[in-house]
Amino acid sequence: MKNFYDWIKEFVRDQGEFIAQQSGWLELERSSYAKLIAQTISHVLNGGSLLVSADSSRHWFLNYILSNLNPKDLKERPLLSVIDFNASSFYPKNDANLSLATIEMTYQNPMFWHVGKIENEGLKTILLSKIPSFLWLFEELKEDCLLLKEHDSLLDYKLLQLFKLFENALFSVLYNKVTL
């Protein structure tokens, strides 16, 4: 039986090596997400609303997105029109078309950002009919979406990397450090 501290040291080293071996994925997949990120940034900077949702397994990530894009201490950042669509009363339950019509009347130029599986038909109708959208999906339901592997052992890590890329790109463009 191994000593606990030796086990931790070995685990950390193994994880570090594994992540290092997989770290090139962002470079390899750049063509699939760069246009989507640029389009989303342009949408937000032109006054559009970004309605964010996630499947039940990635609710933690939804909270992470919302708390990082609009932190409670807004001294350093402007307030962005980023809304928790999962918590919205407009989240489709029965009539997706009615929900979409209400959303479009309520939010200025809404765009949907969904992460994960699409867990109900009403949401699927809305997400797949609204163009443009910023979809990070596990199954290819739409041409312009970022396709991820649900059972990827590094999925959470990749989601965080993608978000950090998006967040840094958004604020770099917003503060005129980068042009679209």
Swiss-Prot record:
One of its GO terms (molecular function) is metal ion binding. Induction: Expressed in logarithmic, stationary and cooccoid stages (at protein level). Ca(2+) 4 binds at N176. Pfam families: HobA. It comes from Helicobacter pylori (strain ATCC 700392 / 26695) (Campylobacter pylori). Keywords: Calcium, Metal-binding. The keyword Ion transport does not apply. This is DNA replication regulator protein HobA. Ca(2+) 1 binds at E17, E27. Forms dimers and homotetramers. Interacts with domains I and II (residues 1-112) of DnaA. In a crystal with domains I and II of DnaA HobA forms tetramers with DnaA fragments bound at the dimer interface of the tetramer. Disruption phenotype: Essential, it cannot be deleted (shown in clinical strain N6). Depletion studies suggest it is required for the initiation of H.pylori chromosome replication (strain N6). Disulfide bonds: none annotated. The lineage of its organism: Bacteria, Pseudomonadati, Campylobacterota, Epsilonproteobacteria, Campylobacterales. The keyword Nucleotide-binding does not apply.
